Amino acid sequence: MGSKVKVGIVGGAGYTGGETLRLLVNHPQVEIAFVQSRSQAGKNVSDLHRDLLGDCDLTFSDTHQHDADVVFLCLGHGESKVFLAGANIPLSTKIIDLSQDFRLSEPSGERDFVYGLPELQREKIKQADNIANPGCFATTIELGLLPLASKGILGEVHTTGITGSTGAGQKLQETSHFSWRTNNVSAYKTLTHQHLKEINQTLKSLQPNFIGSIYFVPWRGAFSRGIYVSSVVKSPLLLDEAYDLFTSFYQNAAFTHVSETMIDLKQVVNTNKCLVHLEKVGDHLIIHTATDNLLKGASGQAVQNMNLMFGLDETAGLKLKANIH
């Protein structure tokens, strides 16, 4: 693509809005047309996102513009549908929605949304006009299970996952307050997490007979960003066979990598990577996956999807390095 992609961000004051902006400021083929935030309208973007001082001279607008090629919706769950219903954005403008509003296959008005998990449907994303960006836990769990579902051998899943405080959003809550979160661990939404519907839908797209038995216990961690998931399934595969399956499935994936050594969270934080490690104990296969919830779990994957939609290098603006010390 010759000219730069003109992008807009709606909901630019929150965590995902700020993270999307940080990526786009450094993207070689992007021009930022506007950053909208009703709560911060008229203020300098760098006054709120202070790490962008010297890198971004934009101000927050209170409205969106109509001349963008693509708009990132970084709004709260339930707000994207309301925004699109009243915004009169031209259908020629592509939409990448980071909320959960359009992830499930159900009627969504004038726009049809494609589920934006590149490892699952890269070619569909390339042709899409509207993307429903996957959830952070959904991304991390799905990337550990897709290879098994692709062979129709995925059975009952028991999974636990721990997430950083940014997964709860920027609005202060009791369970994201530093004095509560630090030196503390707690479970929440046991077996009822909202991403389960999304995960089941995705797995059934590869394995229609999957019965949807996923027993998921999410945990709050005493750190700011990152997700670490361990999923346990019964499997007849030997460990070498499992590694062959996962390595083959992800051989063309730009950001998902299979590691034969144990992974940890620091390897992925501040990157768009998902790392996968496998273990076999008896007849149980254990799949460990790790991502940064704000990047591969949100803004990084959104930019990855934008790159695919506009025929750009899939890794443009996303060649990020973890700080492991």
Regions found by a protein language model. Name each.
Residues 187-191, 219-220, 264-268:
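Short Gly/Pro-enriched turn/cap motifs at secondary-structure boundaries
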Residues 192-258:
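C-terminal substrate-binding/catalytic lobe of Rossmann-fold NAD(P)-dependent dehydrogenases
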Residues 2-183, 188-190, 208-209, 277-281, ...:
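N-terminal Rossmann-like NAD(P) cofactor-binding subdomain of oxidoreductases
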Residues 21, 142-149, 196-200, 300-307:
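Predominant activation on well-ordered alpha-helical scaffold segments within soluble catalytic domains
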Residues 14, 77, 111, 138-139, ...:
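Electropositive phosphate-/nucleotide-binding environments in soluble metabolic enzymes
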Residues 232-325:
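C-terminal active-site/capping subdomain that shapes the small-molecule cofactor and substrate pocket
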Residues 128, 185, 226-230, 284-286:
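Short, solvent-exposed beta-strand edge segments and adjacent coil->beta transition regions
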Residues 26-29, 150-153, 193, 201-208, ...:
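Generic secondary-structure signature for well-ordered alpha-helical cores
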